[in-house]
Amino acid sequence: RGCCNGRGGCSSRWCRDHARCC
């Protein structure tokens, strides 16, 4: 599941935990 795939963007909590999608 990519956060930069149009799902919350890099502002999502999952992104902060896996900040490597952006």
Swiss-Prot record:
Expressed by the venom duct. Disulfide bonds join C3-C15, C4-C21, C10-C22. Coiled coil: none annotated. Keywords: Amidation, Disulfide bond, Ion channel impairing toxin, Neurotoxin, Secreted, Toxin, Voltage-gated sodium channel impairing toxin. GO terms for cellular component: extracellular region. GO terms for molecular function: sodium channel inhibitor activity; toxin activity. The modification Cysteine amide is found at C22. It comes from the Eukaryota. Its main location: secreted. It is found in: Secreted. PROSITE patterns: MU_CONOTOXIN (PS60013). The cysteine framework is III (CC-C-C-CC). Mu-conotoxins block voltage-gated sodium channels (Nav). This toxin potently inhibits hNav1.4/SCN4A (IC(50)=15.11 nM). It also displays lower activities on other human subtypes (Nav1.1/SCN1A; IC(50)=132 nM, Nav1.2/SCN2A; IC(50)=363.8, Nav1.3/SCN3A; IC(50)=89.4, Nav1.6/SCN3A; IC(50)=124.9, Nav1.7/SCN7A; IC(50)=152.2). At Nav1.7/SCN9A, it does not elicit change in channel voltage-dependence of fast inactivation or activation, suggesting it acts as a pore blocker. Interestingly, it blocks current inhibition in an irreversible manner (tested during 35 minutes). Negative results: does not show activity on hNav1.5/SCN5A and hNav1.8/SCN10A (tested at 1 uM). Belongs to the conotoxin M superfamily. This is Mu-conotoxin SxIIIC. It comes from Conus striolatus.
